[in-house]
């Protein structure tokens, strides 16, 4: 319907992005706004499919073009990460936990941004604030969002509020967070059927570092050895994407969630390489720099890159 209000997350949707759209649309519905519907800005990943199937929730509609649509943005606030033609949409609200980006609106809107580990944490608190009871299914989705985005609380983005929220939500949905989180990780780590392109673009975001156009992707696995056979294919795909996406550099975080480390694959211009090496205090060897204790793109990869390229 033309009058629908779409709650939508970022492109290359992850579990927090998709479940936040569903749970926030549900909250709006409970508050009497029946024209609010959840949407996804692309195909959902294996982990999210697992979560939705587990809690018997239908996947949201896919929204590819925001022209003339009424939208509420969740889990992002940057044009490069949003549905196409987002600046031709009527943006009504933004709920997010990332740095303030470049999306602009023609009027004041409700903008809720908090330094927590997941948008799901914010939305759970909004149910409470509005006195709306959380169903077992919605509790499960929000718990999954937090576990996914904080990598089972291991990420430096994780806060006490995230942990306390999961504790509350787990009681409502009746699931053990650690057990459920490990099942989610298994679903996310299953890369057998994934192509190099799937791996690169499965969780891919674009950034502008003082004029340096960059793409930063991430794939989380339980063992980096699983990715070794596809490494050259992935690098070839990254080089191809440099041209097709008109970027100066691409970084792909190959993250081992068990060892809590990331192999940062790099392709890009000589100037971008210099900035990348400066950001991570090392030399690129075989197209990568390996970093212990690096799990979070938001907190451990983007800030050093921004700083390195700052003019």
Curated annotation (Swiss-Prot):
Superkingdom: Archaea
Molecular functions (GO terms): inorganic diphosphate phosphatase activity; metal ion binding
Record-level GO cellular component terms: cytoplasm
SS bond list: none
Cofactor notes: Binds 2 manganese ions per subunit.
Cited SUPFAM superfamilies: DHH phosphoesterases
EC number per UniProt: 3.6.1.1
Positions contributing to Mn(2+) 2 binding: 16, 75, 97, 149
Reaction catalysis annotation: diphosphate + H2O = 2 phosphate + H(+)
InterPro entries with a match to the protein in the record: DDH_dom (IPR001667), DHH_sf (IPR038763), DHHA2 (IPR004097), DHHA2_dom_sf (IPR038222)
Keyword Glycoprotein (UniProt): no
Keywords: Hydrolase, Manganese, Metal-binding
Positions bound to Mn(2+) 1: 10, 14, 75
PANTHER family named in the record: BNIP - RELATED (PTHR12112), MANGANESE-DEPENDENT INORGANIC PYROPHOSPHATASE-RELATED (PTHR12112:SF22)
Subunit structure: Homodimer.
Protein name from the UniProt record: Manganese-dependent inorganic pyrophosphatase
Lineage of producing organism: Archaea, Methanobacteriati, Methanobacteriota, Stenosarchaea group, Methanomicrobia
């Amino acid at each position: 319907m033309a009058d629908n209000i779409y709650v939508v997350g970022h492109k290359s949707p992850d579990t927090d992005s998709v479940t936040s759209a569903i749970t926030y649309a549900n909250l709006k519905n409970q508050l009497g706004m029946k024209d609010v519907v959840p949407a996804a800005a692309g195909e959902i990943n294996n982990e999210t499919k697992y979560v939705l199937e587990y809690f018997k929730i239908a996947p949201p509609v896919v929204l590819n073009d925001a022209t003339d649509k009424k939208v509420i943005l969740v889990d992002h606030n940057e044009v490069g990460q949003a549905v196409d033609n987002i600046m031709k949409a009527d943006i009504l609200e933004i709920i997010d936990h990332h740095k303030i980006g470049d999306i602009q609106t023609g009027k004041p809107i409700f903008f809720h941004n908090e330094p927590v580990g997941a948008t799901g944490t914010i939305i759970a608190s909004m149910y409470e604030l509005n006195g709306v009871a959380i169903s077992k299914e919605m509790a499960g989705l929000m718990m999954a969002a937090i576990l996914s985005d904080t990598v089972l609380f291991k990420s430096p983005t994780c806060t006490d509020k995230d942990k306390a929220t999961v504790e509350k939500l787990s009681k409502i949905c009746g699931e053990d967070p650690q057990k459920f989180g490990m099942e989610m990780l298994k679903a996310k780590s299953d890369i057998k059927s994934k192509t190099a392109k799937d791996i690169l673009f499965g969780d891919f975001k674009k950034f502008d570092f003082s004029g340096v156009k960059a793409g930063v992707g991430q794939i989380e696995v339980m063992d980096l050895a699983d990715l070794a056979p596809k490494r050259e294919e992935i690098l070839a795909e990254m080089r191809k994407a440099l041209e097709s996406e008109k970027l100066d550099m691409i970084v792909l975080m190959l993250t081992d969630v068990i060892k809590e480390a990331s192999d940062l694959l790099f392709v890009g211009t000589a100037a971008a390489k210099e900035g990348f090496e400066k950001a991570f205090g090392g030399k690129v060897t075989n197209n990568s720099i390996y970093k212990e204790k690096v799990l979070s793109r938001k907190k451990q990869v983007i800030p050093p890159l921004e700083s390195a390229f700052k003019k």
